[in-house]
Swiss-Prot record:
It comes from Synechocystis sp. (strain ATCC 27184 / PCC 6803 / Kazusa). GO terms for biological process: translation. This is Small ribosomal subunit protein uS2. One of its GO terms (molecular function) is structural constituent of ribosome. Keywords: Ribonucleoprotein, Ribosomal protein. It holds the Pfam family Ribosomal_S2. The keyword Ribonucleoprotein applies. GO terms for cellular component: cytosolic small ribosomal subunit. Belongs to the universal ribosomal protein uS2 family. InterPro entries: Ribosomal_uS2, Ribosomal_uS2_bac/mit/plastid, Ribosomal_uS2_CS, Ribosomal_uS2_flav_dom_sf. HAMAP family: Ribosomal_uS2_B.
């Protein structure tokens, strides 16, 4: 039985690319045709590459590899969180903070701070700090949970990174390349297949397309751990009216600045 059928791919709109004027010529090998000024992705290739990706993910999981899912656009954020948690992977679904991988030791200090504040809250310690200090601590806790909650249990760099929207997540791509971490990515017709290791040509803008592809990759991880994929199908859809390009940037920058401050305060060896 195939990992995904052509009918499922069609029904989920995986074949719809971008307008022809917005294409990346390097994606030509994965484009079937153009209709009404829109490129159509070759689903026969997508189905085969999904087979390859599924087996790669499943076998990597069996061999103890750890995965990080990355998708910060509004259409992907809820799916990334739900599917990563379902299969036991780590995830980033808000903003990619600079140095999240290449400056991991410093980011991990912020993760430790998150755990410290969560423990303090659970023990009632924040309530005992007074109104002003308690409010400041809760604000800090909220920001850390939002941007680092998905990697709270990640104690080392991931072995493989799964990305939705290669163009948007270019900072994550760059850090993975610098560290030699394999990249699995959904590739729309405006993407560059040369920067990923395991390509999956697919519409990376439609919720149903993202849900199908990311869900199958999560199934592969689940199967690698438990022998059979989980078949649960519920997920939270993000409001299509939200501006996913700039979700609480100021709060994210404060988390990032705190990490950078730790670097500056660390004496050179």
């Amino acid at each position: 039985m195939p990992v995904v059928s052509l009918a499922d791919l069609l029904e989920s709109g995986v074949h719809f690319g971008h307008q022809t004027r917005r294409w990346n010529p390097r994606m030509d090998q994965y484009i079937y045709t153009a209709r009404n000024g829109v490129h159509i992705i070759d689903l026969v290739q997508t189905a085969q590459l999904m087979e390859d990706a599924y087996e790669y993910v499943r076998s990597s999981t069996i061999n103890g590899k750890k995965f990080l899912f990355v998708g910060t656009k509004r259409q992907a954020a809820g799916i990334i969180s739900q599917e990563a948690q379902r299969c036991g992977a780590h995830y980033v679904n808000q903003r990619w903070l600079g140095g999240m991988l290449t400056n991991w030791e410093t980011i991990r200090k912020r993760v430790d701070r998150l755990k410290e504040l969560e423990a303090l809250e659970a023990s009632g310690g924040i309530d005992r700090r007074g109104k002003k200090e308690g409010s400041m601590l809760r604000r800090e806790l909220g920001k850390l949970q939002k941007y680092l909650g998905g990697i709270k249990n990640m104690r080392k760099l991931p072995d493989v990174v799964v990305i939705v929207d290669q163009r948007r997540e270019h900072n994550a791509i760059h850090e993975c390349q610098k560290l030699g971490i394999p990249i699995i990515a959904m590739l729309d017709t405006n993407c560059d297949p040369d920067v990923v290791d395991v390509p999956i040509p697919a519409n990376d803008d439609a919720i149903r397309s993202i849900k199908l592809i990311v869900g199958k990759l999560a199934d592969a991880i689940y199967e690698g751990r438990h022998g059979q994929p989980d078949v649960s199908d519920d997920y939270e859809e993000f409001d299509e009216g939200l501006d996913g390009d700039n979700l609480e940037v100021e709060a994210a920058e404060e988390v990032e600045e705190a990490a950078e401050a730790e670097v500056a305060a660390t004496p050179e060896a």
